[in-house]
């Protein structure tokens, strides 16, 4: 009885963690904002558009490179609930270490970026 109860607990925890991991993929949590334009064993390239005021739910990225097509102001909130305001400039290109966050376009126009997620 104890063995089956422990097995059920472990299985339940694994299912919850697997669901949480899947839910944090930006393409899965916000498919209308994230379009996969290329994916292979080394990278996944996302074409990302957030309309003015639009918020993307909590999601995670591996190490990635962001190229800004149309910049704007954003507010990101990390897992600890700490907000960070930032302004992205047109043509800016930055490296971002792996992170989990929610992000909102706080500007009055659409924000458009290309996000290259590194797999290796």
Specify the residue positions occupied by each region the protein language model found.
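Short beta-strand segments in beta-sandwich/barrel cores
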Residues: 55-56, 72-77, 93
